């Protein structure tokens, strides 16, 4: 599937696995492929560009890592729109070095449109994208944590692994020694993430199968949600999914092999449980109402509003009914 601004992009093959270093997997969102590839890229005299939290954790922003130590700031998912801060201009001025850019598909596309056709030293990784939420969510959530704990944040993650890959937790360490932990699912942060995506994300064209735009990067990374315990790719601490889409992508997956388990994934598994790889995520009904409540009354009030609670009760009831009927069917078949 070709992209609109590159003529060398096609889905070649997909792989799954995780770093052979258990800590590398544990402190990454999935299997640690992005960090492993970036480490090897820097060791080969390149630089990596990715997203980090700001020093006060009120927002996320693009930055450049020239050392392996600087890569740590890119680790774990950021579910908010990242500030660009002139990053496209900055990396275009980098001379005589290879550059690895890691970002959302639309941001990768923007980089190539800005860069032009002379991209010999530019390598790209796009992340399977569900649509980021507004930076205000991070700002409000972080401010509330600081207020409740009477301290500044020194570490924050929305994909913390307590005892395994799933479920996801929000976790924060504070300078005064306190800690905060809560399930991401059902949190005010998660609810806002569902409701406050950019409107344009619901019609995103940077998806596998789109005939005009489609895939844009050398490699796409995400979670291998379809993995099962008996598969070679499986780890209880997380599994990355990597789709190679160009010759440069083949080079990047070869870098991953130096530090990671890399096993082939049949294409049927790539699309089975990774809907956002090939379809945009639909906009939630009530987005504007949720936004008005958030701006007027705050994040917690918006998340607890009837706008959210009534549909949630309906969905939960529907799931219980489906589960009950499935169990009845299984019982009758076994008789």
Task: Tell where the protein language model's regions lie, with residue ranges.
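Conserved active-site and cofactor/substrate-binding residues in soluble primary-metabolism enzymes
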Residues: 28-36, 136, 199, 237, ...
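Long, compositionally biased charged/polar accessory segments in the mid-to-C-terminal portions
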Residues: 44-47, 151-335
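Short, flexible loop segments at boundaries between secondary-structure elements
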Residues: 123-144
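A structural signal for short, well-ordered beta-strand segments and their strand-loop junctions
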Residues: 48-52, 100-103, 124-126, 157, ...
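Short, surface-exposed basic-aromatic patches at helix termini and helix-loop junctions that form
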Residues: 112-123, 142-147
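A glycine-rich beta-strand to alpha-helix segment
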Residues: 96-118
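Iron-sulfur-cluster electron-transfer modules
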Residues: 1-103, 255-335
């Amino acid at each position: 599937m070709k992209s609109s601004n590159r003529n060398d992009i096609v889905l070649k093959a997909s792989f799954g696995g995780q770093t052979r270093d258990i800590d590398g997997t544990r402190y990454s969102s999935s299997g640690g492929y992005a960090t492993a590839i970036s480490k090897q890229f820097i060791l080969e005299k390149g630089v990596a560009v990715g997203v980090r939290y700001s020093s006060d954790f009120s927002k996320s922003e693009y930055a450049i890592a020239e050392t392996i130590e600087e890569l740590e700031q890119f680790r774990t998912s950021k579910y908010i729109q990242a500030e660009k801060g002139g990053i496209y201009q900055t990396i275009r001025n980098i001379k005589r070095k290879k550059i690895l850019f890691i970002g959302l598909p639309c941001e990768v596309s923007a980089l190539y449109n800005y860069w032009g056709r002379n991209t010999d030293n530019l390598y790209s990784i796009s992340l399977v994208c569900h649509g980021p939420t507004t930076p205000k969510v991070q700002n409000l959530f972080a401010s509330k944590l600081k207020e409740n704990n009477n301290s500044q944040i020194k570490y924050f993650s929305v994909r913390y692994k307590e005892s395994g890959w799933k479920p996801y937790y929000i976790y924060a360490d504070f300078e005064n020694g306190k800690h905060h932990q809560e399930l991401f699912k059902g949190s005010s942060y998660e609810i806002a993430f569902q409701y406050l995506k950019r409107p344009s994300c619901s019609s995103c064209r940077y998806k596998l199968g789109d005939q005009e735009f489609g895939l844009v990067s050398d490699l796409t990374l995400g979670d291998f949600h379809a993995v099962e315990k008996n598969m070679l790719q499986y780890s209880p601490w997380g599994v990355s999914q990597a789709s190679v889409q160009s010759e440069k992508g083949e080079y990047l997956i070869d870098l991953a092999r130096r530090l990671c388990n890399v096993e082939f994934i049949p294409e049927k598994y790539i699309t089975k449980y990774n809907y956002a790889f090939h379809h945009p995520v639909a906009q939630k009904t009530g987005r504007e109402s949720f936004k008005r409540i958030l701006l007027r009354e705050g994040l917690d009030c918006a998340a607890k509003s009837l706008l959210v609670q009534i549909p949630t009760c309906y969905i939960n009831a529907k799931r219980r009914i489906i589960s009950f009927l499935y169990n009845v069917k299984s019982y009758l078949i076994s008789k």
